[in-house]
Amino acid sequence: RWVDPACESQIIKMWIYHIFAIRDSLGGNIQLFGTKKSQTQPEPVETIAAQEHKQSIGNQVMEALGVDSFYNNKWGAMGAEIVNPIGCSDCHDPETMNLHISRPALIEAFQRQGKDITKATPQEMRSLVCAQCHVEYYFKGDGKYLTFPWDKGFTVEDMEAYYDEAGFYDYIHKLSRTPILKAQHPDYEIAQMGIHGQRGVSCADCHMPYKSEGGVKFSDHHIQSPLAMIDRTCQTCHRESEETLRNNVYERQR
């Protein structure tokens, strides 16, 4: 992950003595290659749940072990089972190819909010398949049960209140001795609270825009920044030039 040198020292201080102070973020598929090493350690630290969103292990393994047991298993215990990164079946039903939810944590988060995720519209599903992984989460209790802290809502304040009530924190800062929450990647929550999410724009509308080939219209599965294809993303709604739209984004993200 690229880090602005001007921010590097502050980042190191923020994560001092924590692994994120020194370790670069790897791609999900690359991280899977390290599982053999974990098998050689006497007690591999990381649970399967910690990397569930980086692999397409298949629901059959989770069903065979049970969700609780699956989450609490170590990488080393699974061994050769964990060989594939994200694949078609994570988002698509293998029989019908319809969008579907394969991750229990998302279904359970909806249930705790009194919602039935099976009633989601096709447009909502174009974001919910992403929300299986691109979210804030934590490992609840000694069983390390993968949980989304959405019971009170999607805002930062909502999730902070949830964690305060649960008495949860990720680690104690080594200098300040302050309990710290480390947000993972709350992409879905941020999108839902933004103007695009509020107006019904899905993740796929911007990151997997429609394209046509051979008279067939389908979502582009080369997932990337909307700025790489402004004519098919931003300009389907916004009438400004590509240069203006791109500069607007750069200015807001400075």
What residue ranges belong to the model's regions?
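Selective for proline/serine-rich intrinsically disordered segments
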Residues: 40-42
